[in-house]
Amino acid sequence: NLMQFELLIMKVAGRSGIVWYSDY
């Protein structure tokens, strides 16, 4: 599921302090 994948990315990115997913 793409939705779950995006949530996973946000969780990992937030933990790492990355905000590259904010472009979505």
Swiss-Prot record:
EC number: 3.1.1.4
Signal peptide positions (record): none
Main location: secreted
UniProt keyword Lipid metabolism present: yes
A single MF term (Gene Ontology): phospholipase A2 activity
Subcellular location: Secreted
Tissues where this protein is expressed: Expressed by the venom gland.
Keyword list, A-Z: Calcium, Hydrolase, Lipid degradation, Lipid metabolism, Secreted
Top-level division of the source organism's lineage: Eukaryota
Cofactor binding note from Swiss-Prot or TrEMBL: Binds 1 Ca(2+) ion.
Reactions mediated catalytically: a 1,2-diacyl-sn-glycero-3-phosphocholine + H2O = a 1-acyl-sn-glycero-3-phosphocholine + a fatty acid + H(+)
GO CC annotations, alphabetized: extracellular region
Enzyme class: hydrolase
GO biological process, one term: lipid catabolic process
Function of the molecule: PLA2 catalyzes the calcium-dependent hydrolysis of the 2-acyl groups in 3-sn-phosphoglycerides.
Protein family per UniProt: Belongs to the phospholipase A2 family. Group II subfamily.
Note: Hemolytic and neurotoxic activities are not detected.
Protein name: Acidic phospholipase A2 4
Protein species of origin: Trimeresurus stejnegeri
